[in-house]
UniProtKB/Swiss-Prot annotation:
Tissue specificity: Specifically expressed in heart and skeletal muscles.
PANTHER family documented for this protein: ACTIN-BINDING RHO-ACTIVATING PROTEIN, STRIATED MUSCLE ACTIVATOR OF RHO-DEPENDENT SIGNALING-RELATED
Ranges of Polar residues composition bias in the record: 35-47
Annotated protein name in UniProt: Actin-binding Rho-activating protein
Gene source species: Sus scrofa
Domain of life: Eukaryota
Cytoplasm found in the keyword field: yes
GO BP annotation list: positive regulation of Rho protein signal transduction; positive regulation of transcription by RNA polymerase II; protein transport
Domain comment quoted from the record: The actin-binding domain 1 (ABD1) is intrinsically disordered, and binds to F-actin with higher affinity than ABD2.
UniProt KW keywords: Actin-binding, Activator, Cytoplasm, Cytoskeleton, Phosphoprotein, Protein transport, Transcription, Transcription regulation, Translocation, Transport
Residues with Phosphoserine modification: S156, S191
Entry keyword Transcription: yes
Amino acid sequence: MARGEKGRGEGPAKSALRKVRTATLVINLARGWQQWANENSTRQAQEPTGWMPGGARESDQPSGPVIHPTTHQKVQSAPKSPSPKPGGYGAGQSSEGATEVSPIKRKEVTKTIVSKAYERGGDVSHLSHRYEKDGDEPEPEQPESDIDRLLRSHGSPTRRRKCANLVSELTKGWKEMEQEEQEELKCRSDSIDTEDSGYGGETEERPEQDGEQVAIARIKRPLPSQANRFTEKLNCKAQRKYSQVGHLKGRWQQWADEHIQSQKLNPFSDEFDYELAMSTRLHKGDEGYGRPKEGTRTAERAKRAEEHIYREIMDMCFIIRTMAHPRRDGKIQVTFGDLFDRYVRISDKVVGILMRARKHGLVDFEGEMLWQGRDDHVVITLLK
């Protein structure tokens, strides 16, 4: 009974102590947040004001920063009545809280302000309007503006876009000029034919009209010389020859033609042409007979398999070289049974590799085929 009463007496005391600790923790946390809010508001008030829309109209007003009292400052400015704190927390604790460092971590963040698309619209339109002109340099007496610096710099996206458009227009203009020249020659030949036939109409007004047409044509575009025409033709041919789009289109067309031709020769395809396959197949003795077509995946797999088999042949020759001492003539001889017992631990293709090595002239043995158990006494000679 005494232990139960003692436990009941300690329960309220522990709960009261827990409440006091919780209240203390909340008070310290609130004090830290209040200190951080005060420091943040003071820092923001001391920082210079940034750019705001309509800054030209606001320049007439005094440039001093306007500080609006926050809710935290209003609460602090109001008179506070001292309230009793449990656990003996009085003015001493408040003085200690003022001197202690705020537990809230702060980190400086640098933010770059980038103008929006609608804000850059005016500059882009001004740049495009200026570039559409003849591209005159600014007058020497005028100071160089930001627009001139953008136009002179190589990193201007507007300038790159305009240059690309200008190049594309020039390439299109070459073809149009050729067509116009052909049309003019055709019209002149037709007019000469009509004059010779006598159905040209009034002969007095025609020379004046022809002169006006020639003048208008000269105002639009001067007549090119023979050298200029030759240069333009070369440029047009070069553009047609080295055009990226045309080159890509030609490559796709070439691939499509090759695919159609290969499907006609493929016996597993629905488009297989038996007569074409029989007429184009290789016969014994022709170059490439019995081998896959160069550049295909079958040829790549065959090359990898050949390299793998060659490595295994070299490994077998090395094993034979380590099994016995060379004779006086420099050749090494081992029996098939001993070689089989040694090499079977490395690979199970003992007979196949031996046959391949004999084909390449690296080893020699009697008989066309070797059988384990029956041909264990057969001597295998390493030639190289």
